Amino acid sequence: VQPAHLRNVSFNISHHGDWVLLVGDTSLESTVRVGVDVMDFQDQPAGESFDTFSSGFLEQFSAREMAFMKRAAADPAAPVATRNQLRRFYRMWCLKESVVKALGVGLDFNLKSFEFTVPDVEQTIQPTLTTVMQVHEPSADFPEEGWSFEEALLDPDHCYAIAVQTEMEGAGPVMDGSEITKLDWQELLQDAVPYPVQ
């Protein structure tokens, strides 16, 4: 890559519903891997119980992760219970997908080879930075150390997760919850210039 100072640029993009997210890192001191995912809560299966829906994902989530999703409501028969359980499903899916994207592997990657411990509360627009990941068989390609996560709501209908892995020893968390800058399409294009056609 030329120029040389751009060799360590790492970025990732995700889109769903009304949002497009771009995360990046331009640190020159180390190799940083980033991944992001966003999900639209409105994209929900109609008329299906959460147990029926989630049974198709038993190979992707651990028993502990599934239990977290199912604990979303006190009365599992209430319609709001299924909605809240699906919101937790999308939250966990965003976390899994953000790691897969940071690693640069496809969704055929074994999603059960790692699992998350997340705060047992519902997401808000206030970022959660205390999510922890356990890698069951760490390797040079998939270390357990150096991961940081940020997850929150972008609005009432969309959640996101960002995964960052750095190889800097003792770096600690690299996000503090202030990383998200929201731009509408007009702000994004205000300084745009047409690409010269040849």
Task: Give the residues covered by each predicted segment.
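Core catalytic alpha/beta fold that binds nucleotide/phospho-ligands
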Residues: 1-198
